[in-house]
Amino acid sequence: MCTFAPTLFKFSQSTLDLLEAMNPDVRRHFPDHPLASTTFNFGPRTITFPHKDLKNLSWGLCSVTSLGSYDPKKGGHLVLWDLGIAVEFPPYSTILLPSAIILHSNTSIGEDETRMTITQYSSAGLFAWRAYGYMPKGVSTQATTWWKHPKHMFSRVWELTQRVQPGQRMSALP
């Protein structure tokens, strides 16, 4: 996320930094991580039906990591229904996707195979709380259009390629 959506990364991270500063009892699952929540799906044959994660930040990114032992050519594909594609999703791979706005699922795997997932995400409510001045919506006098400004959070290809030196791989970026 830091590499492909650095502005969104900083916004997410600063929101959690502020939350931690205001409440010392709040701790992240992983230090300096920009996503607030983590779900471990232990399987042994984790699959999902087509869904959108409607409580996540609509213009945020969700991280999904696939684990286990299965043949990614035969099953465990990530299906992005709105795009009309199924993507091979091998074990120990991670993808970032806007899970609140893209209908997604994954395909089943073989009877003798295993598949688990780790999903990381942030609730839209955390960002609304920040936009409302750290007060409930009914109490705040802040503008209620905070969710309308996501366009500047995403990187353009030319911005990303400017950060890459000749011969450097994208995966080597900070």
Language-model features and meaning:
Residues 1-62:
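Conserved, ordered domain cores of eukaryotic regulatory proteins
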Residues 59-60, 69-174:
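Catalytic core of Fe(II)/2-oxoglutarate
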